[in-house]
Amino acid sequence: MADNRVNPVPRHVAIIMDGNGRWAKERGSPRLKGHEAGAQSVRVVIKACRDAGVEFLTLYAFSVENWSRPKAEVDGLMRLLVRFMDDQEHELHENRVRLRVIGRLADLPDVVMNSLNRVMERTAGYTDHQLVLALSYGGRTEIAHAARRIAEQVKAGTLQPESVDEACVAANLYAPDIPYPDLLIRTSGEMRISNFLLWQLSYAELYVTPVCWPDFREPHFRAALDDYARRSRRFGGIEPEVKR
Ligand code: IPE
Ligand code: IPE
Ligand code: MG
């Protein structure tokens, strides 16, 4: 069979991990059971990224809008985050993955932030793979935050208004050193971005699967990478992208 792959493995994969609630509902279980089951999919995907050679994995774990959910669900999600850090830290070491977080981190309970900080510090030395958790994250919030930082620099006289260009905005995002996602995967079928990485996804390839997040396994991830490999990324031009 002819291999018509035109793209190499994506350097950065971002995932909207959706469908935990529906997965639980189908089983007659409380929503939190779906979130619990989703933790296993996170482990699977971290390992699959390492095996495939994906350098950056950004997971949408909690949006600024998700604070509007019932308190019991929000509290449960925060507890799960702490548990995930406790249970999975050793796997991050085994896979040599550096943990990062992006979002409005001041919103997070101290107990969550402490556990994230602990794992971030201990994994800070790994350079091959990075896991970026988007927590209390909103794309509009991030861009507004960047605008505020830029305004402060202009006010302080360290930046001229005519120097505010795309590179300047990009430099004031939460994690300016991370390349933009090449591939965005969304599970459980919704065809929307839901305020995720609005700036960074401008030229990402989108892949939506009907599979709910707790059922997402390595073959599903592989299928997304295979699909990506055959996309024609033109970036507004007319020639297929030259191999990087
Ligand atoms: C995604 O699953 C996880 C979070 C948003 C934290 P949902 O909880 O949104 O599941 P559905 O979309 O209701 O099925
Ligand atoms: C997006 O899922 C947020 C996360 C996966 C953390 P949502 O379930 O919150 O998004 P909507 O409400 O379907 O747009
Ligand atoms: Mg959802």
Predicted regions and their residues:
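Flexible, compositionally biased loop and terminal segments
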Residues: 1-244
